[in-house]
Amino acid sequence: MFKKIMIIITVLCMSASVACAQGKKNPVVEMETSLGKVKIELFEKEAPISVKNFLDYANSGFFSDTIFHRVIPGFMIQGGGFTADRKQKPTKAPIKNEAANGLKNDRGTISMARTSAPDSATAQFFINVVNNEMLNRPNPDGAGYAVFGKVVEGMDVVDKIVSVKTQNVNMVFQNMPVQPVFIKSVKVLK
């Protein structure tokens, strides 16, 4: 009898933990920009390192008053690292590239920006405005670009941002908006 009760309790506990794991929702953040709000679901299961990194920066207020410094129609909008006076904000150590997570750089996805070194991403990110298949394939450096979330509300705002007039300021700031587009805040909703 005791053995049957233990089996039943074990099965119930396992069922409850599976149900809890399945019921866990992905975090959602609201990015308030000077052109409107964008809600982004973050894919914690597929990109745990990138999501934790992004949430750490968001929760610390790091993204507040940064700009979208690279805006390219037919490609993407990039931000999260510079102030309006083109000063780069100090970041934490780079993270491991999670591009092999199975997620694709499709329209509306958010990915980690990086240099030509695969594991060089810190705070900067980009939102794809079209399907960017070439970013999924390993580049000459051996890696693609890590998707870690998707816009779930406010893609019209992203489209507004990508349509602003841009300029080439210098070799570092190519395709920079003439009038800065600010990230006012990034708040975790759930």
For each of these PLM feature ranges, what is it?
Residues 2-9, 13, 19-190:
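Cyclophilin-like peptidyl-prolyl cis-trans isomerases
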